[in-house]
Every structure is written in structure tokens, then in C-alpha cells.
């Protein structure tokens, strides 16, 4: 397919990702047609017609450079992010986090985009994928059915599905490897799972804690969709004391290795129950808890799941969530610049690409918008270094294992590891990663 010769770029959706994409394109001197259906057609979750509205929390999370999202925000500031700039201008006290006056922030983003001389705001619902120009689609996690069908068809009838559950993800370096063993069920294929065995006593205590743990409240627009997807582990536990033993905690085919010295029930060769951990990224630094999709409160997840042998001191880089979302099979469908592999004139941004969180959504819009503009100008694509947060996040969502791909927040586990001996002190290690990231980003920008 040849590159579009249109004199403008379309951006569909004026949430965080779409607003950022539109600004990044316009600041490079390219006219933008920015489509937003709110004002013509309401959504269940939005309260206003303002751009970049924050639907749930008003927090952009941690602001320290020893926090991955804090690093991402600093990188975005250096890249002239409209979301970060207006967030700073409408900041409210929140300790070490960055929180904003929800209404003031959204109004200021809206005003800046509506008053930009190169941005034409069109309040209308888009039900077809435009073919008149380079287009960035950033329609959010609840994309309308009509447009979702078109995206589904564009991708060959595959790769755009409803996301109902995500299991927690753990930093491998915080797992007590002396209590787990590597094995695949029935020894099929290579040993690919870390197995956390439980005795009957351990399982009974875990089951009791899980069934009595406090669940997170549901948003009104999620309630009717809650049980359409995978069953939460806590719901499964409440259906019967042995239900999980025939599901994600099934021990069959996961016998103890010969050198196992941990607790066991008598001379049994197989544990009473097993929790499996599956590698979540190519680097092998992250593992998810297989089958443990959940809607427990985050504090409860930490308390209950740290009862699993080997996870007593585990650090969770993402807690499990339950809600309906639309997201793409980005590893198969998108390049590292969020460009469609099937249609080079088409870019996607926001939560539909598999990034999770306000800041991450805006960052994806920055990457997609920047590269849509570079395509328009027939310039080489800009892929940020994997040593940066804004480079590692697109790399993760477009290179993850497609079969097990789930949305992801930015975290240090997906950023390229430091060279040389591992820095044992976590704070010092994160400071070193952040320092390298900002230096590499500055070098990247200086080379343009």
C-alpha cells in the first residue's frame, strides 16, 4: 500500500493518547483532523465532553525517578508532552505522587487543542476506518462496536478481543527460588514453569484467606460485564474447597524433583496443590501467576498471594484486574512505533494497544503521533532506545508472547538491564537505570 498523499493526518479519539498524538503531529507543522464522539454520543464511563478526561483516579502515580512511571513522566516532559505540561499546571498535593485537578487539567488540554491553528476538532462518531489520510486510532478501551468490527476485519478477523482478566505479574528476582522448581506438566516440551508446591495444610490456609479476602468495588459501567470473561480466582475458590485443585492449582503431572527438600505431605511424590508461574517477557525478568485473574483489592492480593511458597517477599509489578476492555494482539499486528503491519498508513495508540494506565496511554500517543508525523514527512521511523521507559513499553507490547499477551504498566522489569555486575541495592539500581535512560534519550534526541 502506498503512502497517503493527503495534506493532513486524522486522529480518532481525544482521550489521553489521542490528545497527545494530535499535539505531537500539529507541533511538527502538520494539519490534524481530531475526531471525538463525546458531545454527539455519550459513553458510559465519561462524565464530560473534555479531552483527555480522567475517568477513574486523578493520579498519574509516583513521581520519583526510582519509580518506573516517574521515569516515564520525566522522559515525556523532555519530549514536550501536552499531557504532562497541563498536568503540571493543574497539580494538586499528593505526597510523592503526581495528582491533578481533574476538571482543570482536562479543560486546559481541551482549550489548547481546540485553539491550535493546525487542529480541526470534529465532534462526530467514526464507524469506518478512514482511508483518506494517515490515521491514528486512539478510541480507548471501550471502542464502539461499529468501529471495533472494522478493526477486527482489518486484522483478518483476528487480533481484537475483549479483555476480561489479567493475573498479577511478579519480579522474578524477588522469588525465593529455593522453594520452587522448574517443570512443565507431564514434562511436555522444555521445562517452562516455576512451580510453587503446597502441602494440604498450606492449601487449606490459602483457600481460607482467599475466600475471605476483600474484593475491589466495581465501576458502574463494569458491573454488567463482570462475569462475561474469565472467572476470578476468588470466585472459583468460593465454589468449593477443591475447585481450584481441578483448575489452576491442579498438581497432576507436576511431581517433586528428586532434589526437592521442602515441606511435603508424607512420602507423596506429587504436591497437594501447585501454583504455576509463567515467564511474561523475553528477558525472563517477569513472571505471571497462571490462572490467577482476580478482582481483589491490591493490598489483599499482596497479603494473600504472598502466602504462596516462594512468593513470601515477591514484588508485584502489576496487580491482577478484572474488567472488560478491548485490546489488540499488538505483538502480531503492530510495529514498535504502533504502526499497523497490515496498513502502514494506520497507527494505533492508547489502551487498545495493550498499554495500561493514564501515563502509559499518553506515552503511546506520543510515540504514535511522532511517527505518524515522520511518515507524513517521509522521514525514518523514530524508535526510542530500549534503555528508556518510553522505548521499552512499545517494545514490550509489540514483542511479548502473543499467546499470553496481556496489557502492561511500565515497570523496571521491561527496561533493558544494566550492563556489568548487578547493583544489589534496589534504590541505587533504579537510580542507575533512570540516569542511563535520560542520558540515552538526550543522545537520541540530539541525533535527530
From Swiss-Prot:
It catalyses: uridine(54) in tRNA + (6R)-5,10-methylene-5,6,7,8-tetrahydrofolate + NADH + H(+) = 5-methyluridine(54) in tRNA + (6S)-5,6,7,8-tetrahydrofolate + NAD(+); uridine(54) in tRNA + (6R)-5,10-methylene-5,6,7,8-tetrahydrofolate + NADPH + H(+) = 5-methyluridine(54) in tRNA + (6S)-5,6,7,8-tetrahydrofolate + NADP(+). It is found in: Cytoplasm. GO terms for biological process: tRNA methylation; tRNA wobble uridine modification. Its EC number is 2.1.1.74. FAD binds at residues 13-18. It is an enzyme of class 2 (transferase). Its cofactor is FAD. Its main location: cytoplasm. InterPro entries: FAD/NAD-bd_sf, MnmG-rel, MnmG-rel_CS, MnmG_N, TrmFO. It holds the Pfam family GIDA. GO terms for molecular function: flavin adenine dinucleotide binding; tRNA (uracil(54)-C5)-methyltransferase activity, 5,10-methylenetetrahydrofolate-dependent. Keywords: Cytoplasm, FAD, Flavoprotein, Methyltransferase, NAD, NADP, Transferase, tRNA processing. One of its GO terms (cellular component) is cytosol. Catalyzes the folate-dependent formation of 5-methyl-uridine at position 54 (M-5-U54) in all tRNAs. Belongs to the MnmG family. TrmFO subfamily. This is Methylenetetrahydrofolate--tRNA-(uracil-5-)-methyltransferase TrmFO. It comes from Streptococcus pyogenes serotype M28 (strain MGAS6180).
